[in-house]
């Protein structure tokens, strides 16, 4: 398996060349993951599909990702803070009002170009090999990527889902519209700055005899307290290391 992955890695590097931003081989998991720039996405995907030794003829999945606050620790335990469960019982806070911010608190103002990404899972049926491709949107405020529907027709609904949930625009998509939420939905619910309780709620009005939108009436309350336990997964190894150092 490791040798086959190394051969695939070499083939990908040779075929994509400078279009390859990153290439990570995880032999333990049997995975190869690459990253390409948005300007090179469509051409790189076409190469991955058509090139000899690659032949990724199937797009198995496409998922949007919001990396806002990725790698930051939200499990503060010494003080009460706005990113924990406490915000669910405080009235008139950012999460309640729907003001943009990480977990409903800090406002997002910096454009990092590393917030929104699309991740593609590719399969070569002919060569029985897999590849993960990631591509970041350059603009956090208006994330755009090229559509790959003309490369793999199965990308159609995948891209619509990523647009619906994350607001990623796929340029060149033949019918880019919502697929999971209704057409009047406000915002993109999988973004990390989307209010936990939403912006509006929908109900059937008996008098008007139709479905109506109204302000959220939910009173959010967390009934299960946050419990932070000590991490004992490596306790035995830690004790052995401490014993060795004492000796």
From Swiss-Prot:
Record-level Gene Ontology MF annotations: NADH dehydrogenase (ubiquinone) activity; NADH:ubiquinone reductase (non-electrogenic) activity; quinone binding
Keyword presence, Cytoplasm: no
Record-level GO cellular component terms: plasma membrane
UniProt keyword Translocase, yes or no: yes
InterPro entries: NADH_DH_suC, NADH_quin_OxRdtase_su_C/D-like, NADH_UbQ_OxRdtase_30kDa_su, NADH_UbQ_OxRdtase_CS
Any single Pfam family the record assigns to this protein: Complex1_30kDa
UniProt KW keywords: Cell inner membrane, Cell membrane, Membrane, NAD, Quinone, Translocase, Transport, Ubiquinone
Membrane topology recorded in Swiss-Prot or TrEMBL: Peripheral membrane protein
Catalysed reactions listed for this entry: a quinone + NADH + 5 H(+)(in) = a quinol + NAD(+) + 4 H(+)(out)
Main localization of the protein described in the UniProt heading: membrane
SUPFAM superfamilies reported in the protein's UniProt record: Nqo5-like
Compartment(s) where it occurs, according to its Swiss-Prot or TrEMBL record: Cell inner membrane
EC number: 7.1.1.-
Primary role: NDH-1 shuttles electrons from NADH, via FMN and iron-sulfur (Fe-S) centers, to quinones in the respiratory chain. The immediate electron acceptor for the enzyme in this species is believed to be ubiquinone. Couples the redox reaction to proton translocation (for every two electrons transferred, four hydrogen ions are translocated across the cytoplasmic membrane), and thus conserves the redox energy in a proton gradient.
Family stated for the protein in its record: Belongs to the complex I 30 kDa subunit family.
Subunit structure: NDH-1 is composed of 14 different subunits. Subunits NuoB, C, D, E, F, and G constitute the peripheral sector of the complex.
Entries under HAMAP family matching the protein: NDH1_NuoC
Protein name: NADH-quinone oxidoreductase subunit C
């Amino acid at each position: 398996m490791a040798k086959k992955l190394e051969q695939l890695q070499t083939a990908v590097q040779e075929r994509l060349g400078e279009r390859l931003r990153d290439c990570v081989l995880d032999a333990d998991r049997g995975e190869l993951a690459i990253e390409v720039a948005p300007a090179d996405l469509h051409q790189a995907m076409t190469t991955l599909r058509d090139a000899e030794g690659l032949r990724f003829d199937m797009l198995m999945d496409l998922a949007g990702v919001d990396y806002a606050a990725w790698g930051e620790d939200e499990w503060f335990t010494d003080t009460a803070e706005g990113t924990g469960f406490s915000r669910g019982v405080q009235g008139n806070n950012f999460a309640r009002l729907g003001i943009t911010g990480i977990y409903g608190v800090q406002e997002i103002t910096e454009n990092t170009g590393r917030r929104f990404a699309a991740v593609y899972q590719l399969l070569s049926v002919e060569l029985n090999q897999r590849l993960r491709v990631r591509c970041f949107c350059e603009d956090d405020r208006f994330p755009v990527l090229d559509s790959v529907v003309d490369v793999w027709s199965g990308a159609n609904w995948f891209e619509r889902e990523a647009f619906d949930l994350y607001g990623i625009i796929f340029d060149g998509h033949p019918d880019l519209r919502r697929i999971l939420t209704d057409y009047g939905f406000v915002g993109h619910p999988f973004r990390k700055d989307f209010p936990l309780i939403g912006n509006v709620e929908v109900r059937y009005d008996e008098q008007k005899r139709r479905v109506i939108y109204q302000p959220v009436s939910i009173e959010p309350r967390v009934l299960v307290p946050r419990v932070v336990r000590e991490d004992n997964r490596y306790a035995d190894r830690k004790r052995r290391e401490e014993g060795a150092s004492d000796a």
